[in-house]
Amino acid sequence: MATSSVSKGCFVFKPNFKKRKISVPIEDYFNKGKNESEDSKLRFETYHLMWEQMKCETERLQEELNKNLFDSLIEFLQKSHTGFKKNSGDWGHQIKHREIPVAALVLGVNVTDHDLIFRSLTEALQNNVTPYVVSLQAKDCPDMKHFLQKLISQLMACCVDAKPKEKESIQVTQKMTHCSMDPLSSWYMTVTQKTHPKISGKKRTTSSKWQSPPVVLILKDMESFTTKILQDFIIISSQHLHEFPLILIFGIATSPIIIHRLLPHAVSSLLCIELFQSLPCKEHLTTVLDKLLLTAQFPFKISEKVLQILTNIFLYHDFSIQNFVKGLQLSLLEHFYSQPLSVLCCSLPEAKRRINFLSAHQCENIRRLPSFRRYVEKQVSEKQVALLTNERFLKEETQSLLENLHVYHTNYFLVLRCLHNFTSSLPKYPLGRQIRELYCTCLEKNIWDSEEYASALQLLRMLARDDLMTILQKCFKVFKSSSEKQLGSTAKRIEEFLAQFQSLDADAKEEEDASGSQPKGLQKTDLYHLQKSLLEMKELRRTSKKQTRFEVLREKVVNFIDCLVREYLLPPETQPLHEVVYFSAAHTLREHLNAAPRIALHTALNDPYFYIKNEALKSEEGCIPNIAPDICIAYKLHLECSRLINLVDWSEAFATVVTAAEKMESNSATTEEMNEIIHARFIRAVSELELLGFIKPTKQKTDHVARLTWGGC
């Protein structure tokens, strides 16, 4: 940069002002290129609001499911070290207080959910037991030194009531103190004596009752810790237990037997272990499905194939509730992104209000829906013309159809729960043991056309009186909570059935018992008379078979349930406008959640436009776009090579492709500088391909690399 001054000196040249990058609002991503939708912002806001409601409901469910487990843990921790400050000369008392209290927390193999559980557990312990709660992972503790360093650093960070000067001294001692239990014990005694009179706040409400609050150490992944670290720490801690009240919580993913496999008897005898078991993952899944999908509270629903994908990933991959909820969130996002009419996927009063403001283009979208077309075809000719030409009449009819869809879902889930109560206890579970299995079957087809449903009805016709009454009482509670007019009489009908069962007199019971008992006349006879009597009895039963009062009433109950199923458990595809609330793009969801890594990697490198929606990246098959990412260019070039790739030839080909785009951008840089930049870009692209496993160095030739993959992917 030049200056017109003739004197010598230093001149300051301010850099050019760089424009601040304007961040694109998230709702703008709902616009598909040129086809900009006028309600994209409203759809995004609706999605965000619904997801926040579903997220809050999920968190509340997790708290309720973990409440019993946390309460048991807190009770165990509060009972531990109760006599910490009691000086007793009793030998048994001294031996007992040399044992470290251990809570073996078996959480299952859903490791991805453990962090959330431990986070909630830490908060619960700090609110109810002690402020000194430390969590350690095996990856942060390769040896005893790092183990104690992490323990001391986190423990000293728990001292929240210290003054600024005390905090500085704590940080200094944290750096200078030798990592051992002696200074840690003395620090604990000093801190508890200082902070005990001043303890206040939510986190110390319960711990203030303790003369010396315990230190809780959570080992999140106990199986991953080395045996030597665990043994040394337990032995050392047991010697300082009289001055450093330690409680251990072992996070176990497999089985409690792992404790005895990792620790010898001499070490495990220093522990006072109590086992705690979390709820099975399948119960968590059933509860989440029950509160998020099997309810009319949230209008968003998913199809049978989408639900099958989410449950299969859960059951056959990770057992993770968090991943299941993320898959549900992705389904919700894809639905609001791909379906323009998802703007009506909200509460019924709000949906009716939004229908009044629909544009002409949105009305055409309603007319294009396959379910609405089938509905129009069933109407009379005059109504068909009005629906296809009159927007006002269309909006009124849409409001009515959405209201019918809401009533359909309310009745659907009530009858579904009733049917599940009847079939969940049948032998061999013909319709599934879990309600999600029954729900998938009902979403897929007419359930009454299946063989499993027919076999379930046969088994229901053989239920005993007590079992049938128990099931009817459960169904009565389900329908009693309903306020719908159509199902209001159902609860009364079930109540009548229960009254009739209770009014069965003793004669009916005796008649039922007599029908299954053998006559008393066949006590002693020969073979001929026995055969003759059996034939007569068989003929008598065939000609004069009469049902008891109980059998007649049981048949009425089964027929009544069958009528409910045929009337209310219709597949969602039969309902007009079901596309507004149902997400059915199972293929899209499978690509995102259960994609094959190798195929996805090949697609990204071979066709970057597939993931980066940039029109400049479009190219014909076999061609290399000039402005593609460097790794894509290097990958396409390496596909044309044989088993050994010459790095020089590969670099020259890479430079040839890249310079075709560079020359059009700027000509200010010199040729040497451009070559150095291109060479550095090539080295980085080759290193990335090596990291991904496409190539590797070879000792056959120094300037060559070996290709590791063949074929299209």
From Swiss-Prot:
Subcellular location: Nucleus
SS bonds (residue pairs): none
UniProt organism field: Spermophilus citellus (European ground squirrel)
Lineage: Eukaryota, Metazoa, Chordata, Craniata, Vertebrata
UniProt record similarity statement: Belongs to the ORC3 family.
Assembly information from the UniProt record: Component of ORC, a complex composed of at least 6 subunits: ORC1, ORC2, ORC3, ORC4, ORC5 and ORC6. ORC is regulated in a cell-cycle dependent manner. It is sequentially assembled at the exit from anaphase of mitosis and disassembled as cells enter S phase.
Molecular function via GO: DNA replication origin binding
UniProt-recorded name of the protein: Origin recognition complex subunit 3
GO-annotated biological processes: DNA replication initiation
Signal peptide start and end residues: none
Pfam families per the UniProt record, alphabetical: ORC3_ins (PF19675), ORC3_N (PF07034), ORC_WH_C (PF18137)
